[in-house]
Amino acid sequence: MNILKAIKKLFKTKDGVKRKMTYPSVEALRILHQMEAVEKQAVILKERHGADFNSFFYRHMTFNIIKSEVMSVLYPKHRSEIYTDIHWDSHWHEKHVLNFPGPIYTGVTDNGGAGECAPENVMVDQEGCEYIYHQPRNYTQLIEVSLAAELDPFNAYSCDGNKHWNYELVKNWWHNRSEWISQLMDPLLIKHNGADIVQLYIDYLNSDTAELDLRRYCFFLLNNYYPAEDNMDLPIIS
């Protein structure tokens, strides 16, 4: 909640005394309200489905989970029929190469900045098109990515990655990570995202953590369930 703390500081001076006649901007208030709403929605999902997010998220039909569970939390006052109108169509044939393998990915998105709703999961390329650099790790991030998907006018977010990724494809993607890192070093891409964010993805791709995440994902693809944290009997990808 670093952003939330930063916004709240707008109300105070360094000594903790509230400023007189000083208010955060409309944009800051919008972000604050959105973050508070997302946190409340994440709590609802956790109460309904338990603390084990990976068991909830990594299922064969992630598409159905998002439509039936996540969207019902985002739109609790709407009839269930509305969820069929929310687009998470398949865009595998135009999947962005910088998408980190997993259930959610993007095709050719708009460049209007919808990904700003999910800063811990979404980046943009040289043209401002969005891609997933981190699969959601908790209910909060899943809701934020879902919000970004809704805001994309091209409806280019997809959640049928489990139908298309397989062990060999994940291995090949990981084998080519030096190419993905090279693309991330493009000056225009860095300008769009900020050097710190780009470095986060580069460091992730160079880490044992990313490899372990993909090995666990391959285990899921091969066995149709996500492995326990202490399960190290995982497929080799390098």
Annotate each language-model stretch with its function:
Residues N2-S238:
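Non-ligating segments of multi-cofactor redox enzymes
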